[in-house]
Amino acid sequence: MQITDVRIKLLNIDNRLKAIASVTFDDEIVIHDIKVIEGEEGLFLAMPSRKVGNDRYRDIAHPISSPAREKIETAVINKYNEEFEKQSSVETEPVTEENMETAENENE
């Protein structure tokens, strides 16, 4: 199976959960709710899961082989880094009286 699309939703919260991803395979099947988490040794993925019992979670979908897991991790983390760079490169100009006046004049 080939990964044909990766979509990332960056989360602007200050904790370990950095993003949620969806991965499409062969333009035919998609896995939603893959979590991108910041660990002590860098980013890693948590596959979608549901709670079973009091403190246990069970994956809803997950790769069966190490090469498949690595392929998904590489695709998702690369897309995360790409989207993070896009978001970080958006520069905002500090608000000053001068640029507020300019904006007001442009809107007239």
UniProtKB/Swiss-Prot annotation:
Region annotation Disordered: where it falls in the sequence: 84-108
GO terms classed as biological process: division septum assembly; sporulation resulting in formation of a cellular spore
Composition-biased stretches (Acidic residues)? 94-108
- Keywords in UniProt for this one? Cell cycle, Cell division, Septation
Q: Hey, what's the signal peptide range on this chain? A: none
* Pfam families xref list: SpoVG
InterPro entries found in the cross-reference section: SpoVG, SpoVG_sf
Function according to Swiss-Prot or TrEMBL: Could be involved in septation.
Member of which family?
Belongs to the SpoVG family.
Protein name listed in UniProt:
Putative septation protein SpoVG
Query: What organism is listed for this UniProt entry?
Result: Finegoldia magna (strain ATCC 29328 / DSM 20472 / WAL 2508) (Peptostreptococcus magnus)
Q: Which gene produces this protein?
A: spoVG
